[in-house]
Amino acid sequence: MAHHHDHEHDHNHDERELITLVDDQGNETLFEILLTIDGQEEFGKNYVLLIPASAEEDENGEVEIQAYSYIENENGTEGDLQPIPEDATAEWDMIEEVFNSFMEEE
């Protein structure tokens, strides 16, 4: 049974969820999972928003956020991250709406 996250849950900010991404050259970068979004009903996949684990805010108080779609494996512990196409307007609109709600709660 897969464990699906919903954007309406509380994050325990004392325990950071970390993930390692490996680029095409084999370089590993550690990221913190900022938010997971259940998009199964609308788009048939889930989404994750990541920030570099060592990220510091820039002069505007902002941190680079990366967004990916994924489909969890059967045991719900991992999945393959896929880039979200730039022209997937409905997906980006939903992600932005959920992210803005998440930030208002913080």
From Swiss-Prot:
Q: Which Pfam families match?
A: DUF1292
Signal peptide positions on this chain: none
Question: Superkingdom of the source?
Answer: Bacteria
Q: Which family does it belong to?
A: Belongs to the UPF0473 family.
Please identify the protein, giving its name as recorded: UPF0473 protein SSU05_0068
What high-level taxonomic lineage is stated for the organism? Bacteria, Bacillati, Bacillota, Bacilli, Lactobacillales
